Amino acid sequence: MAAARKDAIAVLPQPYVTAAQMKDSGLRVVLDLTREWNKVCDTQLITGVTVVRTEYAKQNPNVIAAFLTDYQKSVKAANEDIDGTAALCEEVGVVAKAAIAKKALPKCNIVYRNGQEMKKDISAYLQVLYDASPAAVGGKLPDDNFYYTEPSVLRKVMAAIRNSAK
């Protein structure tokens, strides 16, 4: 759409901005949302989250722990093995070509956040949305039960993983 008009403005996340630029070399990035966020906030800009029903998390703490462990490893692999991740992105249809992902991945800012760090980041993000329009977050900010901040079994599993990595 933006490419159809010379005066158009678009806000696109990675990898879509890179895909658009590879199709139209005249497109340019005039600001980086992460950099702009960092100028006004001391938290990480949140653009994606994993959601789980509370009941399921309580009934399946080992499944949640295993998922989060795999997720953390996946984030690490995505940042360290750009070629492999790019090929996987093409294979599963995230992007049309691995070349797009290969160029975009270093700009994607893929991170793993959990516990209080995650809660701080998401709370700040939701506060910005709420301040702009309370309806954007359902009219009120969520309470502490909204955040999954690792029950004791998960803390033990995560500590064991961190210790084994040393």
Regions found by a protein language model. Give the residues of each.
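Pocket-lining segment of extracytoplasmic ligand-binding domains
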Residues: 3-89
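Residue-level "edge-of-site" marker
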Residues: 15, 102, 118, 142-143
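Short secondary-structure capping/turn micro-motifs that flank functional sites
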Residues: 18-19, 95, 105, 145-146
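A generic structural signal for short, solvent-exposed coil/turn residues
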Residues: 21, 42, 102, 138-140
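Short alpha-helix boundary/capping motifs
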Residues: 29-30, 113-118, 157-158
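Secondary-structure end/capping motifs
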Residues: 57-136
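Conserved C-terminal helix/tail region of periplasmic/extracytoplasmic solute-binding proteins
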Residues: 123, 127-166
